[in-house]
Design a protein with these regions (language model features):
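Active-site alpha-helix of zinc metalloproteases
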Residues: 136
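N-terminal cationic and glycine-rich segments that engage phosphates or anionic surfaces
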Residues: 2-89, 93-115, 123, 127-130, ...
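Function-critical acidic carboxylates
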Residues: 120
Length: 147
């Protein structure tokens, strides 16, 4: 069963159990996926779904930061709850040590030597690691390894 199908099944389960927050969060997530399908006129692969899920998490992290700055702790908790639900559909993320090791090995393979090679290393890292790492964490690890 693909990620998209799992989300649809979990919506049904949440409806049956009366978990309104989970149901509504998953419906918003499904709507975001459907919007991309309609806009791009494609059927989403699991890799594409993972990238959309990461975008949704990033969007909610940004919202939570703004709510925190505005003193709206109730909305911060809501966003954090949605982040947890969305993150449960992503593959396991690499640990910091694994990420640093992967970045170092890619830099060695590519013969990268400094910040000017950052783009080349990031491209190769994205292809190699896929959705198992957040882009921001990957960028930080590559920067640290290039220094």
């Amino acid at each position: 069963m693909g990620v998209r199908e799992q989300i649809l099944e979990d919506i049904k389960t949440a409806m049956k159990s009366g978990d309104h927050f989970r149901r509504d969060s998953l419906r918003m997530l499904n709507a975001a996926l459907k919007q991309v399908e309609v806009d791009e006129r494609i059927s989403l692969s699991d890799e594409r779904v993972f990238s959309i899920l990461q975008s949704e998490i990033k969007r909610r992290n940004d919202s939570a930061a703004q709510y925190r700055a505005g003193g709206r702790d109730d909305l911060v908790q809501k966003e954090q709850g949605e982040i947890e639900i969305i993150a449960s559909y992503l593959p396991a993320q690499l640990s910091d040590a694994e990420l640093a090791a992967a970045a170092s090995s890619l830099i060695a393979q590519l013969g990268a030597s400094g910040a000017k090679d950052m783009g080349r290393v990031m491209k190769a890292a994205k292809e190699a690691l896929g959705s198992s790492v957040d882009g921001k964490r990957l960028s930080e690890a590559v920067k640290a390894a290039l220094k």
